[in-house]
Every structure is written in C-alpha cells, then in structure tokens.
Curated annotation (Swiss-Prot):
Pfam families in the record: Phage_XkdX
Protein name: Uncharacterized protein YqcE
Gene source species: Bacillus subtilis (strain 168)
Family from the record: To B.subtilis XkdX.
InterPro entries for this protein: XkdX
Superkingdom, natural source: Bacteria
Length: 54
C-alpha cells in the first residue's frame, strides 16, 4: 500500500499534498484505486485528486 493513500486515510496528508505526490510520481492513480478497493479512501476523494470519476 502506498504511503500517500494511508496518509490520506489517516488525515496525515491533504488531497492537495497527494496531488503534488502524483505530480512528482511518488503516488499514482492506480495506488488511489487500490485504496478505494481496500476502503481506505472514497471515490469522491479520488475524483477530487485526479479530476476523474472512477
């Protein structure tokens, strides 16, 4: 599990921070999708971060 997904789940990071992590290639949309599958983040959070619906 990607650190940023866990950080978002535990409120250690904001959506903006995760957007920056994706830009820096430290996290990917696929990592976020895995977080949704494991019920760590919501589809709404995914859309807020990526701009795309899942």
């Amino acid at each position: 599990m990607n650190y940023w997904v866990l950080a978002l789940h535990y409120n250690w990071a904001s959506s903006e921070m995760v957007k920056q992590a994706i830009h820096l290639k430290d996290c990917s949309p696929e990592d976020l999708q895995e977080g949704i599958e494991k019920k760590l983040i919501t589809a709404e959070q995914y859309k807020e971060i990526t701009g795309e619906a899942i």
